Amino acid sequence: MNTNTPAHPPEGAPLSEATQAALASAEHAPDSPGATHIRSFVHRRGHITQRQRDALEQLMGKWSVPYAPRPLDMAATFGRQAPTILEIGFGMGETTEKIALARPGDNFLGVEVFNAGVGSLLHRIEESAIANLRIVQHDAVEVVRDMIAPDSLAGVHVYFPDPWPKKRHHKRRLLQPPFVALLASRLAPGGYLHCATDWEDYAVQMLEVLGGEPLLRNTADGYAPRPDFRPQTKFETRGLRLGHGVWDLMFKRA
């Protein structure tokens, strides 16, 4: 689950200057003068483990792609032509790792802003030798807008984004009509947008927003069953056992 809890190196154990420069694009304050939209995340000081720090230091150049305001050449990035799936907000990367390993014929591009999650997934990629997975550490809206070519994606995953439960913060929710329209434009015809949330109010909003996008059609009558390719997380399993709901939505590009 992506709880949007940021992670910065604790005092007294900084990353190298080179690594700090590589991570700089993801470390801007939310709604800064350089931002062109309301950000769906807020940075606070948080914990990062030594293993995550080592992965950031040693593996960013191997498995990550730096943000750049131009379309990404997917074939060059992955070293092959294959359907590309974009995963937005992968948290600590457990689900992303499992899906990428189970679908070796697809390329996966994960987007996350927080150092702990990026470091965690970098370690997973290296440890499991996941050749079909890359990371961009940057704001997802800007990545989709600037780095993803129109009509190019086979799928998009948005799993458990921050629900921003207070009404005054709903404007920070990621899945707003302008961003959904942008995502739809980046899907190839027949490509899918799969979202999941454990916050009912957000599920209702997602269904309304996705249902209102002309380029998308719902593959279910309302909410969809969890597809086999999305593993059930430990957090989700515990929540279901306690009677909490989880809502999946599956839409396809018309």
Curated annotation (Swiss-Prot):
Give the residues the record marks as binding substrate: K166, D198, T233, K234, F235, E236
Cellular component (GO) terms are: tRNA methyltransferase complex
The catalytic activity of this protein is classed by the Enzyme Commission as 2.1.1.33
InterPro entries the record matches:
SAM-dependent_MTases_sf, tRNA_(Gua-N-7)_MeTrfase_Trmb, tRNA_methyltr_TrmB_bact
Which Gene3D superfamilies does the UniProt record give? Vaccinia Virus protein VP39
Transmembrane spans: none
Q: What are the positions of the active site?
A: D162
What is known about what this protein does? Catalyzes the formation of N(7)-methylguanine at position 46 (m7G46) in tRNA.
Protein name, as recorded: tRNA (guanine-N(7)-)-methyltransferase
According to its UniProt entry, this protein's organism is Bordetella parapertussis (strain 12822 / ATCC BAA-587 / NCTC 13253)
Taxonomic lineage from the root: Bacteria, Pseudomonadati, Pseudomonadota, Betaproteobacteria, Burkholderiales
From the UniProt record, report the name of the gene that encodes this protein.
Answer: trmB
